[in-house]
Amino acid sequence: MIFIDLLKDEYTEELSDFVHKLRNNFLFQNKFDSNLAKNRTTIIKSLKKQISNRNHFVIFEETKLIGYLVLDLDDKELLIKEIYLDKINKSILFKIFRFLMDYALSNLFDIIKFKFNGFIFDEIIKDHLDDQNRLEIKNDMFEESHKKFAIISFKAKNGLIKFLKGNDYEVIYSFDSKKMDEKVSDHVDMQIRKINENAFVCTQESYFHYRAYLPNYITLYVTELEITNKYPKDCLLNNFSIENYLVCNKKSVDPVILKLLKDEKIIMVKQGYSKCSTIVTDKFVITSDKSIYASVQKQSIKAYLIDSGEIKLEGYDTGFIGGTCGYCADLGVVFYGNLENYKFKNKLIEFLEKENIKYYYTDDDFIDRGSIIFN
């Protein structure tokens, strides 16, 4: 696994050793940064000064530091100012290029090109360079089979994990948020939102986690606003789409969502946690929120209303029905916990069976863990 992260204070000791070792033996280099002197102490001081710039990145393979990347911006182009790697292969290169593409898109560049002036090019990327020594990255550059995956809470029980893997879904675990309330730090629907099969949006703090685990063909945008543990900034991504409608409270939705889904008509609801409150399928919704129920029906979207409450959410009086599960066409509605433990199970099962939707549940409390996202 290739993991890219912002340069942080905790990385400076290890990175100084890395830079010191490679100072005369770079696979890629534009020019050696004059601030990175030969003396290791000077290197550490220089690196610490760069942390606040937020354009210096470290590259790991598993837990081993293998690279260092410095970016710069110039006339709507993203420049690789410096890149130092102690090994190179297609997997590493493409993960770096995928990160660069996300970075450009999240900064709303008109074009996605990267200059490599003075670099030595690996055979892997020579065919992708234009006559100005630039690389334009497109999704079809990433020759990957589109494997099925599910993003689930890192607190999910083994029964669910085995079920998903047994149905050929790769499991991606949620990020452990340090900005959210600890009781919902694992909740998928607070951290990441699916736009379509090839594009997702995630919170700023979770980007490097999801970029490491998501396939390279997925474009991963980042929220414009920073998530907090207070409403409305705790639910920037907690909205949903159905039949070309975006169901949300505009006061709590991140601007990036509105830009990416500008062609969808907005159904305005009072509920800021609209995804938490709703089971969303291709053709209908099941919700415990009366404002969502009434609003979507006005647009001729089929909806079912279920009683609120009686759902476990540690530290809270109750959880939300949408947070208990996720939907995909081949598996139906997949629950984190045991539907038999849900007070209103008969009504919920009635809705699902009326629509010929399969459902699966595991042996756990009927619990809200922040939805499951399938792709």
Identify what each model region corresponds to.
Residues 82-92:
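A short, internal acetyl-CoA/4′-phosphopantetheine-binding micro-motif in the GNAT/acyltransferase core
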Residues 58, 64-72, 79:
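Conserved beta-strand in the GNAT
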Residues 113-124, 134:
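Conserved beta-strand-loop-alpha-helix junction that forms the acyl-donor binding cleft
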Residues 95-111:
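Conserved acyl-CoA
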Residues 1-26:
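A short beta-loop-alpha structural element at the N-terminal edge
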Residues 42-58, 67:
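A short helix-loop-beta-strand connector motif used in the catalytic cores of GNAT acetyltransferases and
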Residues 140-375:
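Histidine/cysteine-enriched polar flanking segments
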Residues 24-45:
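Conserved GNAT-fold acetyl-CoA-binding loop/helix
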